[in-house]
């Protein structure tokens, strides 16, 4: 991957490994969308658009030769730069076990937030509709644990009516979930009751959304399409610091909105 220019960086193999490993650790916990949507690819840096399998006919009816354009989603290319102190990185070679990578860590969190923003809320300029865009798939939910369980049962009833199989997953705002746990009563934990309702699915708490949604994880309904997966490259050297960047190319497609239900508190 020459475009990353990693071989030009004044960094050792051990330093690159530490940077990559730390970024991977944070991405693993902060990429909430990837915990329940299908991930396709990566198809490579040159993959510029994802075909939608449709043709928009643009020719007139009276034309002998009919023609149109194939529909596709252009990939979003993101790039976020950060700097690291070279002397601090050299401390890694001296045996220091916990070098300061705070600039990297903060940038990784911002990149993860951007990807999740596209998955949940979409990106109008790139033609992406996010999961929360489908207001017609919304049901109201009260503020008690009983209300939550009833809303999940209603959501599953809608899935059954629409022929959407499970397992099902509850994606819920972290603070909302904590408040439900505080209010739960009885000897049987709320978490267990919810998991039983979801029929083999799971509970994902996230700060990315204000309310909640129930989704089917049967597969094929929500696709995160990757060209170049999250990667770190070299940009420049600034005296005693090195400027690096995180890049990714991707798009997101809701293939079947019937596989999600929004819960509005």
UniProtKB/Swiss-Prot annotation:
InterPro entries, alphabetized: ENCAP, Encapsulin_nc
Keyword Flavoprotein: yes
Binding site for FMN: 79-81, 87, 235
Keywords: Encapsulin nanocompartment, Flavoprotein, FMN, Ion transport, Iron, Iron storage, Iron transport, Transport
Keyword ATP-binding applies: no
GO CC list: encapsulin nanocompartment
Subunit structure, interactors included: This encapsulin nanocompartment is formed by 60 subunits; monomers form pentamers which assemble to form shells. There are 12 pores where the pentamers meet as well as 3-fold axis channels and dimer channels; none are larger than 3-4 Angstroms in diameter. The N-terminus of the protein is inside the shell, the C-terminus is outside.
Subcellular location: Encapsulin nanocompartment
Entry protein name: Type 1 encapsulin shell protein
Naturally occurring in which organism (per UniProt): Thermotoga petrophila (strain ATCC BAA-488 / DSM 13995 / JCM 10881 / RKU-1)
Stretches for region Pore-forming loop: 184-189
Cofactor(s) the protein needs: FMN
Purpose of the protein: Shell component of a type 1 encapsulin nanocompartment. Assembles into proteinaceous shells 23-24 nm in diameter with 2-2.5 nm thick walls. Cargo protein Flp (ferritin-like protein, may store iron) is targeted to the interior via its C-terminal extension.
One of the protein's GO biological processes: iron ion transport
Annotated family: Belongs to the encapsulin family. Family 1 subfamily.
Main subcellular location of this protein, as a coarse class: other
């Amino acid at each position: 991957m020459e475009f990353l220019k990693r071989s030009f960086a004044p960094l050792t193999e051990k330093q690159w490994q530490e940077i990559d490993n730390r970024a991977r650790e944070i991405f693993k916990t902060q990429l909430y969308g990837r915990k329940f949507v299908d991930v396709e690819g990566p198809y490579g840096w040159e993959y510029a658009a994802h075909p939608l399998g449709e043709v928009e006919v643009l020719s007139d009816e009276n034309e002998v030769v009919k023609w149109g354009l194939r529909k596709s989603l252009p990939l979003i290319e993101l790039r976020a730069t950060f700097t690291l102190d070279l002397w601090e990185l050299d401390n890694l070679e001296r045996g220091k076990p916990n070098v300061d990578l705070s600039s990297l860590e903060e940038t990784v969190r911002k990149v993860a937030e951007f990807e999740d923003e596209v998955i949940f809320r979409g990106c109008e300029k790139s033609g992406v509709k996010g999961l929360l865009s489908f207001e017609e798939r919304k049901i109201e939910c009260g503020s008690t644990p009983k209300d939550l369980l009833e809303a999940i049962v209603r959501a599953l009833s809608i899935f059954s009516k629409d022929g959407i199989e499970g397992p099902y997953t509850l994606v819920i705002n972290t603070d909302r979930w904590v408040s439900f746990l505080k209010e739960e009563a009885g000897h049987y934990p709320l978490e267990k009751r919810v998991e039983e309702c979801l029929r083999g699915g799971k509970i994902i708490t996230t700060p990315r959304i204000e309310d909640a949604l129930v989704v089917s994880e049967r597969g094929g309904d929500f696709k995160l399409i990757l060209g170049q997966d999250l990667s770190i490259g070299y940009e420049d050297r600034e005296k005693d610091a090195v400027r690096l960047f995180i890049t990714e190319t991707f798009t997101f497609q809701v293939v079947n909105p019937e596989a999600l239900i929004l819960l509005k508190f």
